Amino acid sequence: MVQQGFSIDLILARSREEAADGKDSMSSRPHIPCAPQPLPPNKYAKEMPRRKDGQDVQEHSSWSLGEQGKKLQYSSPSSAALHRSWGSSDDFSSVGSEDDSTEGSPSPMRNSQETETDHRGESPKSDLQRHLRTAFTPQQISKLEQAFNKQRYLGASERKKLATSLRLSEIQVKTWFQNRRMKLKRQIQDQQHNMVPPPVCYPQTFPYYPGVLPVPLNSGSFYQPPAHPFQAPQNSYIPDPRFIPQPLPHHIRMSVALQQQYPPLGLPPGRYFTGLASKNDG
């Protein structure tokens, strides 16, 4: 065995050599990041490789000071590389399994797109069938109009007879009658809307006083409405019952009896002159 000295110079020289060897190894080794680079967002981003404890794969490096000097210590990259390769293999296997599953089972997006294309392909045909209208001949229209003027609602037997006579189907006849009824309803509504209601004339009623002879309406004794709605009435005349003569002459009594027998328009018989007759009888 070769005995080595334990002098300070030998220890310092040995530490310098080890530090130089460490620098050379650092320059020769590839750079390994402490944390993995983030992957671009994709549909498999949720299935990142994780450890059992739930933490991402990370690499740690530590620096420690020894008794003889500063020594650079690195964690062995073999375990990290193995772990990374294991995670990448799992990732690729998961991607492959998903691809196989997607190829084996049709996705809902494809099903929805196929159904939409099917509906789009069928929609023009249905629209054409819906918008097809029956072209009636003038003879058919005239016979249908005659049947409609006689009866607006047809029974099953009558509709069948009419359809066979016109060489039409029962559905066509039924549809024509429905449209004709709607047309008639619109015409009636338009006529009612365009019609102007005639002016309503109400009979003028005047208070009756015993002993007063009927006065013509064109005289100024009764109140007449003003010509302008904002014009105030100038004068009005109401006879005073104190100046009515008592008892009444015979011809006035006869007129009272006639008025009781034939009352004015819109008034029940015996409503007026009852008080006057009782006075005269007394």
UniProtKB/Swiss-Prot annotation:
InterPro entries: HD, HD_metazoa, Homeobox_CS, Homeobox_NK-like, Homeodomain-like_sf. Induction: By bmp4 and its downstream effector smad1. Fgf enhances bmp4-induced expression. Keywords: Developmental protein, DNA-binding, Homeobox, Nucleus. Residues 17-128 are annotated as: Disordered. GO terms for cellular component: nucleus. Residues 86-96, 103-114 have a biased composition (Polar residues). GO terms for molecular function: DNA-binding transcription factor activity, RNA polymerase II-specific; RNA polymerase II cis-regulatory region sequence-specific DNA binding; sequence-specific DNA binding. PANTHER family: HOMEOBOX PROTEIN NKX (PTHR24340), VENT HOMEOBOX (PTHR24340:SF112). The repressor activity is mostly localized to the C-terminal region. This is Homeobox protein pv.1.
